[in-house]
Amino acid sequence: MRIDCTVASLTALASGCQALSTRPYVPRGHSLSRRDDSAPIYRDASYCIDERVDDLLARMTIEEKAGQLFHTRLMDGPLDDEGSGNNAHNSTSNMIGEKHMTHFNLASDITNATETAEFINRIQELALQTRLGIPVTVSTDPRHSFTENVGTGFKAGVFSQWPESIGLAALRDPYVVRKFAEVAKEEYIAVGIRAALHPQVDLSTEPRWARISNTWGENSTLTSELLVEYIKGFQGDKLGPQSVKTVTKHFPGGGPVENGEDSHFAYGKNQTYPGNNLEEHLKPFKAAIAAGATEIMPYYSRPIGTEYEPVAFSFNKRIVTELLRNELGFEGIVLTDWGLITDGYIAGQYMPARAWGVENLTELERAARILDAGCDQFGGEERPELIVQLVQEGTVSEDRIDVSVRRLLREKFVLGLFDNPFVDPESAGRVVGNDYFVRLGREAQRRSYTLLSNNEDIVPLKKIEQSTKFYIEGFNASFIESWNYTVVDSPEEADYALLRYNAPYEPRPGGFEANMHAGSLAFNDTEKARQAKIYSTVPTIVDIVMDRPAVIPEIIEQAKAVFASYGSDSNAFLDVVFGVSAPEGKLPFDLPSSMEAVEAQMEDVPFDTRNPVFKFGHGLSYANPCASSSSKCS
């Protein structure tokens, strides 16, 4: 029986009904003419969502259903562009028109919000021209911080710029996390992005792992508290037309990778639990599910030395179906991480399919195994013909495909995409990177600084002469010169040295792999000796960008003051040094005392390095901290 959604609006969320809350934006020259008395049920917003899903699903061919199960990258540019060489790919027109795909990850830098909104509108126009007119869901990796790696995230560009997630954890302010998520949501929606391929709630129990900066550290309680605010900020109390859906990753926790090596790569495919501590890594996912997480992504890794089969998590039925769905009660969408079926290239680097533990399976067999495990959608793949073949051969039933397609379609209806797929490009230009959002991000950058040491209370440098000379490394002289101080060429000429260093890492080859900071957490002996000469020559203030917990006992001992930062520009650094802002951050992880201690610790156990230089929660305050709530000094 048809339910009148006008009458039922007060119980819409409970009944599956949802009426439009805003008038849809319609691009010039286009009319949503399908909405008339003869429109099918799925096109009629007065029907309830479940009825609309049922109607649409019944109209779909197996080819159209198969297209929904794939979620791959989308490059800004001509819709018929197929790339070339190692960057060859199916054109957007082909993926939407021929492969029936409607889920895409925008994998380009955004340099102009208006133009990006116009581009996504063109994508939606193309989708509406298909037989069923299913709108596109556009997703993105994180875009609001300082990391630039096509496989994991993008620099903020035109968006407001905030600390990495690890910096929000250092700040330990749930309000700031909620505000960040609300701001990011508004900026995403403005350009047409409706899915966030984050938060990353892995516990950073292995200090060498290359992906710590997007986590909230190694404490499960803090991570769980902050991720709730994050999800609520993006989605609201309930997913709806004003939401950006989140994808919580990487189940069942990607932190305890063997020897800290990342499972994007074959040498890092193993995940290990020498402390028998899987349950600790599940705690953030339990919190996410309780907070309304609608989508979860397993990681590439395969568990070793556990009760589970040593195959990658998305191929692992006991992980996805028995643990995630049955034991934890998750009823939403499971999206695999990228590239589990097909070999390919990332940033020009050859990357075999991350089918760890099932490398011997054919592409067809891999697809079948992933579906059998309980996953709904294949990330980073564009192979719907495999699903069609599996159904036609009888290997996978169409009913099984319908289960996943129903979840995916329902989400599009809940987000309001069938009724309002377009965005206003002019509004995007006003919303994205507006002054208020930018100011909030800059304040968070400054507040998240962690003061590790402050010998003789050298910072803040508030009472220094205008003739003071600075030796600097790691940032441009123009930042100091804007304060009307002089920059000199050597430590011997300087009154103070200001140094900004990335946390140590061992460079790796390859276009993609080179961007993953991995290996040793300590500076090599040559670099230590070079730095020591500076520390012995002039009072030195050091900032270490802690994308991983650096092993720097020698810097703590020799420098006058040491900060940890987690994504900030040089203006933020100088504001903290000169006392315009005060550091409020607390360490979101232990700082190890040596690489020997790192190598001896157990990958799955938090706070497990011997005699850390500083423990989780360490962070000094200035002797005379600013009194205002914004931590600004007059």
Curated annotation (Swiss-Prot):
- Gene3D superfamilies on file: Glycoside hydrolase family 3 C-terminal domain, Glycoside hydrolase, family 3, N-terminal domain
Give the range the annotation lists for the signal sequence.
1-19
Q: Supply the InterPro entries for this chain.
A: Cellulose_Degrad_GH3, Glyco_hydro_3_C, Glyco_hydro_3_C_sf, Glyco_hydro_3_N, Glyco_hydro_3_N_sf, Glycoside_hydrolase_SF
| Cross-referenced SUPFAM superfamilies | (Trans)glycosidases, Beta-D-glucan exohydrolase, C-terminal domain
Q: Just give the chief location class.
A: secreted
Gene Ontology cellular-component annotations: extracellular region
Question: What class does this enzyme belong to in the EC scheme?
Answer: hydrolase
The biological process GO terms on file are: cellulose catabolic process
Glycosylated position list: 90, 112, 219, 270, 360, 476, 484, 524
Alphabetically ordered keywords of this record: Carbohydrate metabolism, Cellulose degradation, Glycoprotein, Glycosidase, Hydrolase, Polysaccharide degradation, Secreted, Signal
A GO molecular-function descriptor: beta-glucosidase activity
Query: Which pathway does the protein contribute to?
Result: Glycan metabolism; cellulose degradation
Substrates-to-products reaction catalysed = Hydrolysis of terminal, non-reducing beta-D-glucosyl residues with release of beta-D-glucose
Give the enzyme's EC designation.
Answer: 3.2.1.21
Q: Where is the active site?
A: 337
Tell me where on the tree of life, at the top rank, the source sits. Answer: Eukaryota
Q: Give its localization.
A: Secreted
As for what it does, the entry says: Beta-glucosidases are one of a number of cellulolytic enzymes involved in the degradation of cellulosic biomass. Catalyzes the last step releasing glucose from the inhibitory cellobiose.
Write down the PANTHER family for this protein, in alphabetical order.
LYSOSOMAL BETA GLUCOSIDASE, PERIPLASMIC BETA-GLUCOSIDASE-RELATED
Say which family it is in: Belongs to the glycosyl hydrolase 3 family.
Q: What is this protein called?
A: Probable beta-glucosidase C
Source organism of this protein record: Aspergillus flavus (strain ATCC 200026 / FGSC A1120 / IAM 13836 / NRRL 3357 / JCM 12722 / SRRC 167)
Gene encoding the protein = bglC
